[in-house]
């Protein structure tokens, strides 16, 4: 395991396996309008429906917004954007990111690395855990796959 604290920030659209590698960290923050997934909504729409113009629909189904991923425990924080968006006021956006990083790194630096590693491990063990099996799993378990 990595023996230092790791903090990542998704600034815009992270839509690839390479982007997902940035998520292997102690804390993952996203700008409030950022997207984070293994594939872009446009790419998913192209594959699923052979129609890239359905990217908004794909985005909604994929649940890859900062708010969605905070709910799922993938993201740990959402960094607010200025009223005009991240690119509308770069100074304010930079300040918001800096405040998050300073606060997070200060908190992490107070912890023993063994505790950080255990927390990181626990965080990733919780991602993707569901309390109820899906309808498809229930049908398959009952032997009714064709219903």
Question: What label would you give each PLM region?
Answer:
Residues 1-3:
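Short, small-residue-biased leader/transition segments that mark boundaries at the very start
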Residues 39-147:
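Amphipathic alpha-helical segments at domain termini/boundaries
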Residues 26-28, 32, 93-96:
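Short, electropositive alpha-helical surface patch
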Residues 12, 31, 80-81:
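Conserved residues at the C-terminal ends of beta-strands
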Residues 6, 28-29, 78:
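Short, well-ordered beta-strand core segments
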Residues 17-19, 23, 31-50:
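CoA-thioester-processing core
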Residues 11, 20, 58:
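Glycine- and other small-residue-rich loops at beta-strand/loop junctions that grip anionic moieties
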Residues 5-13:
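A short, small-residue-rich loop immediately preceding and capping a beta-strand
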């Amino acid at each position: 395991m990595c023996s230092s604290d790791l903090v990542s920030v998704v600034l815009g659209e992270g839509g690839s396996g390479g982007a997902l590698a940035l998520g292997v960290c102690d804390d993952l923050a996203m700008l409030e309008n950022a997207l984070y997934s293994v594939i872009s909504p446009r790419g998913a729409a192209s594959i699923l429906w052979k129609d890239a113009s359905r990217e908004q629909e794909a985005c909604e189904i994929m649940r890859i917004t900062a708010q969605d991923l905070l709910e799922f425990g993938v993201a740990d924080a959402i960094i607010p954007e200025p009223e005009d968006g991240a690119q509308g006021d770069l100074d304010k956006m930079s300040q918001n990111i800096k405040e998050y990083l300073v606060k997070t790194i200060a908190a992490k630096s107070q912890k023993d690395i063994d505790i950080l590693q255990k927390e990181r491990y626990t965080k990733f063990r919780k991602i993707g855990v569901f309390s109820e099996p899906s309808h498809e799993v229930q049908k398959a378990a009952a032997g009714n796959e064709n219903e």
